[in-house]
Amino acid sequence: LHLSLRRQRQMCIRDSNTAVSVAAEALDRLHTTGETHHRIMVLEVMGRYAGWIALESAIAGGADVALIPEIPYDINKAVEKINERREEGKNFSIVVVAEGAIPQGGTITVQNVRNNGAGVDNNKLGGVGQVVAKQLEELTGLEARTTTLGYVQRGGTPTAFDRVLSTKYGAKAMELALEGKFGVLTVIKNGKLDSVSLEDVVGNNTKIGAVSGNTAESNIRKVTMDHDLVKTARDIGICLGD
């Protein structure tokens, strides 16, 4: 499940445990080839205009750099981090890049601009991992390789956490239907199962994700700078590109 709200307050209808687990496992595997071949391994992950998957997997998978849409990055900051590691005798680095990551003063990387005519954003994001890898290779002199997980993150066997969560949501949805309550979405609110009107969720969000300059005009729930994940990443030395 991966649906996010700007008006979340104490509401949570977003979880991506399986996707994060897949990305973290990929990072575990990339450590091996990165270390043995003295390379910069760049992993591009999904998430559209939000950096939840990138940030969580970077923490879980021991990445050195994590670039997310919410923090426009300065590639030189990533270079500094990589060079610091080299001075410590670590001739490889792991970089996680969210597909919606944006360079400072730049624009989002879009493979294909698509619009259904009703203002709905169907842009195909992707490719920023290659851009970052090329820049890092040129600026550090180290080989850089890119891995893009893409839809691998969305398939396969879900984690036990996601199985339990989806079952809880499904049971709650059935309960609501039997009560004749329609047009609602099951959520976790204040730690308990609840429901919210679809109108509150969707509202005017049919025109989400319109990219203007370097700004993704959307109503999705993004990582905030005071979130504990941001603090944790910084505390353990992950460079966020700023």
Place the predicted regions along the sequence by residue.
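Single conserved hydrophobic/aromatic residue that forms the stacking wall/gate
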Residues: L1-I13
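Histidine-centered active-site/metal-ligand motif
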Residues: H2, H37, Y151
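Short, ordered loop/turn segments at secondary-structure junctions
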Residues: R6-R7, E70-Y73, E99-I102, L149-R154, ...
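Short beta-strand elements at the ligand-binding edges of bilobed clamshell
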Residues: Q10, R14-T18, T157-R163
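Accessory alpha-helical/coil subdomains and C-terminal extensions
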Residues: S16-E35, E44-E143
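Generic beta-strand structural signal
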Residues: R39-M41
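C-terminal non-catalytic interaction/assembly regions of soluble proteins
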Residues: K124-D242
